[in-house]
A protein has these predicted regions:
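Acidic-glycine-rich active-site phosphate/pyrophosphate-binding loop
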Residues: 74-88, 151-152, 167-178, 303, ...
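Acidic/histidine-rich catalytic neighborhood of metal-dependent amide-processing enzymes
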Residues: 100-174
């Protein structure tokens, strides 16, 4: 399995541009002698999903194993070659090591072992490697719109959870705000309408609207002003400004209702400041995720973890979004996140993964698929 991981880490799928078709082809070939159905779903521009299925004895209630094929860009600050896997002190270093080609290798290796065992599972086991998770989620959307979720009861996504049982994930809204005010001399700010001040003030109002309440696995919702631009000159009050906010929501939050409240707050601010105009647009919308407490697979994973490793499996939640939020727009199913990677190392220089954690994740996944 570690050899498989090494080979996948050496395939460049930085997004942009993605080029996931290369890795999808590799996985398709890896399963070529495996007794399973397999296909490639082309989504254009050198990008593709790869899907495989082990047919079960009974229809419905399929288990889907999911992982994304792309990685974020390498970035600077590396002490190793990010596109060449390097083993050191029991860890593998490369872009995608934690997020999430290690999880991809675990699910792929366990899937092929299960297919080659000749033991037919009770229900279908589906493997889905998706493109573009790190950007727009187009791969997951294409997979869902092709009807490939129609018989799926549970999706196990091999995102980095440090071997924890991921039962919840924050939702995400990227909100673009644009303000038009009135310029004037910087010495007489009272004569103008400061667009930058208006957007920073709105950001505070949004933060108050979003926050409040906590989740046992996720903590608090957050609203962070991450980008702002505006102004022409240091001695001129800016009449134009644009900002971006990263909003992370908790399970139970309806994004449509939340955006409606934010628009109302912006309208109230404009009413209180004649001449001010504010425009809002949603750039990314990923719903929060929470696994049902009585999920059969979640309960069985906990039991197997204790049996295999003689310790309880920790429950965890993730602040980042995944393809789970896309899938749940199309199917009412349970989503569990589990993988050997560490979320703290995702998207960082010198990203790495523990080889021991990969082997433990494989043992658990292998045991789970024997009972699927």
């Amino acid at each position: 399995m570690i050899r498989l991981l090494n080979e996948m880490l050496n395939i460049d799928t930085q997004n942009p541009p993605g080029n996931e078709r290369i890795l999808a082809d590799y996985i398709f070939r890896y399963l070529s002698e495996c007794p399973c159905e397999r296909s490639l779903q082309d989504i254009g521009n050198g990008r593709a999903n790869v899907i495989a299925r082990i047919k079960g004895r009974e229809p419905g209630r399929a288990l889907m194993l999911n992982g994304h094929l792309d990685t974020v860009p390498n970035g600077a600050g590396w002490h190793t070659d990010p596109q060449r896997a390097e083993e050191k002190d029991g860890r593998l270093y490369a872009r995608g090591a934690s997020d999430m080609k290690s999880g991809l290798a675990v699910m792929l290796f366990a899937f092929r072992e299960t297919a080659e065992s000749g033991i037919r599972p009770a229900h279908d086991i589906v493997l889905a490697g998706t493109a573009d998770e790190e950007s727009g989620g187009f791969g997951a959307r294409a997979l869902a719109e092709a009807g490939l979720l129609k018989d799926v009861e549970t999706i196990l996504i091999f995102e980095p959870t440090d071997l924890g049982l991921g039962l919840a994930a924050k939702g995400c809204l990227w909100l673009r705000t644009q303000a038009s005010g009135k310029t004037c001399h910087g010495a007489y700010p009272e004569r103008g309408i400061n667009a930058i001040d208006s957007l920073t003030g709105l950001a505070g109002i949004i933060r108050e609207t979003v926050t409040g309440g906590t989740h046992p696995l996720l903590g608090q919702a957050t609203a962070t002003l991450t980008q702002i631009a505006g102004g022409l000159k240091v001695n001129m009050v800016p009449d134009r400004a644009e900002a971006m906010m990263d909003i992370r929501t908790l399970p139970g939050t309806d994004h449509q209702t939340l955006v409606r409240k934010i628009r109302q707050k912006a309208e109230e601010l404009c009413t209180a400041t004649p001449g001010l105009e504010i425009r809002l647009s949603v750039e990314n919308n990923r719903r929060p995720v929470e696994t049902r407490r009585r999920s059969v697979y979640a309960q069985r994973m906990e039991q197997l973890y204790r049996e295999l490793f003689n310790e309880p499996m920790k429950h965890t939640g993730t602040a980042f979004f995944s393809d789970a939020s896309v899938f749940l727009n199309y199917a009412d199913c349970d989503v569990i996140q589990f993988g050997p990677g560490e979320s703290a190392l995702a998207h960082t220089p010198d990203e790495s993964v523990s080889i021991e954690a990969c082997e433990k994740a494989l043992r658990l996944t292998r045991a789970l698929l024997k009972e699927a």
